[in-house]
UniProtKB/Swiss-Prot annotation:
Keywords: Antimicrobial, Bacteriolytic enzyme, Disulfide bond, Glycosidase, Hydrolase, Secreted. This is Lysozyme C. Residues 2-131 form the C-type lysozyme domain. Optimum temperature is 40 degrees Celsius. Activity rapidly decreases within 30 minutes of incubation at 90 degrees Celsius. Its EC number is 3.2.1.17. It is found in: Secreted. Disulfide bonds join C7-C129, C31-C117, C66-C82, C78-C96. GO terms for molecular function: lysozyme activity. It comes from Pelodiscus sinensis (Chinese softshell turtle). Gene3D superfamilies: 1.10.530.10. SMART domains: LYZ1. Lysozyme C is capable of both hydrolysis and transglycosylation; it also shows a slight esterase activity. It acts rapidly on both peptide-substituted and unsubstituted peptidoglycan, and slowly on chitin oligosaccharides. Optimum pH is 6.0.
Length: 131
């Protein structure tokens, strides 16, 4: 995995076409990544309730989005192995996140976005970054 610097991650998200994707700004994505994983691509968190695991910089869940071979009734809507989401290269995580925000909930799929980023001035997350 890799722990990104804030502006470095903003540049990566921008390079992957996330600025304005489905109406969400770069600040929304950087804010969400900060509160989900502290910018760490290797982050994992197990959810005892449904026995799923959240993976990577955006903490994408194995119940719906990726396959880890151990989550009951998993859907794998992104069609990827969860291990792809832990790589230093965030391409797989970004592509899956794009799939997730196309759902009616949008970024509401991320608890951290709803709690810490929604309705806030998220431009502060990219302030001073050379983008």
């Amino acid at each position: 995995g890799k722990i990104y610097e804030q502006c470095e991650l903003a540049r990566e998200f921008k390079r992957h076409g996330m600025d304005g994707y489905h109406g969400y700004s770069l600040g929304d994505w950087v804010c969400t990544a900060k509160h989900e994983s502290n910018f760490n691509t290797a982050a994992t968190n197990y959810n005892r309730g449904d026995q799923s695991t959240d993976y990577g910089i955006l903490q994408i869940n194995s119940r719906w989005w990726c396959n880890d071979g151990k989550t009951p009734k998993a859907k794998n809507a992104c069609g990827i192995e969860c291990s792809e989401l832990l790589k230093a290269d965030i391409t797989a995580a970004v592509n899956c996140a794009k799939r997730i925000v196309r759902d009616p909930n949008g970024m509401g799929a991320w608890v951290a976005w709803t709690k810490y980023c929604k309705g806030k001035d998220v431009s502060q997350w990219i302030k001073g970054c050379k983008l």
